[in-house]
Amino acid sequence: MAKRSILHMFDPMPNNSPFDINMALDAGFDVLMPYSNVKLETIHNLTQDAIFSRSPSASKKTAIFIGGRDMGMAIDMLQATKPAMVPPFEVSVFADPSGACTTAAALVACVEKALKQHHGKELKGSKAVVFGGTGPVGIATGVIASLQGAETILVDHLSIDSAKDAAKQYNRRFGATMSGGVARNDEEKAALIADADLVFCTAKAGIRVINAAVLAQAKQLKVAGDVNAVPPSGIEGIELNDLSAPLNLANQATNAVGVGALAIGNVKYQLQHELLKMMLEAEKPVFLDFREAFTKARTLV
């Protein structure tokens, strides 16, 4: 009898994400096994239980997905699986906490494409501001943009120290060069975007972060991307399906365009589907996080 494909879903939170479960089933996995409240120190043993219970030939039909809501923890868990592998007993692993890796990759890829198409510019050398920058999507967005050469600021809505700490932590981990900023009010938001080329809005759903008055202070804005699909939009003037639509509220910034949440979400959905399929189809184990996600996202926009 043919071996069925199994996805072991490790999550440090009390519940696994129904979104990820649906995506994994639709990508072709036969059996999904969710694990909640998983501790970092248990990853090694869980991984070895997964690899040694099937023959090396069946390893291609076994994979691990790491969820949760903490980017650092998810990457730590992914790294913890690697020394647990004993070739030829090894499986593929994909970390995507709260969909942060795939959402961020889709967001940056969409903004990058718009930047090239409408302004003939690259991420390298651009100034990027990430609102909601201390959350998982914001952190991944910031790291991706920074590694591509953008001067990147992670923005927290309450504390400059939180933003600086996040930037320092992830700079050290991934070789990025981000800085921290704070936006407690419209004046601070306006100061941050005044000379920004790119604005990424990755704040909580249903919160208007950038209003028309703030946008009007942007003097060199080229592209803004908003991942908030719950009204009101995170950036006023960007509609859900906008894909490089004129951002007229940024009236000091010539030819500024916006990318909306559903346009980004369509790429994110395709991307997560493709990365899950990649684990099923790979001849050799793959280890996937936001870096591999961004590489793939560029082929989908």
What are these regions (language model features)?
Residues 114-198:
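Glycine-rich phosphate/diphosphate-binding loop of Rossmann-like nucleotide-binding domains
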Residues 2-3, 230-301:
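Adenosine-phosphate binding glycine-rich loop
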Residues 1-89, 291-301:
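N-terminal ligand-binding/catalytic initiation module
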Residues 86-94, 124, 253-255:
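Glycine/charged-rich beta-loop-alpha catalytic/anionic-binding loops adjacent to active sites
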Residues 95-113:
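A glycine-rich, Thr/Ser-enriched phosphate-binding loop motif common to dinucleotide/cofactor-binding enzymes
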Residues 104, 135-141, 163, 207-210, ...:
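Short glycine/serine/threonine-rich phosphate/pyrophosphate-binding segments
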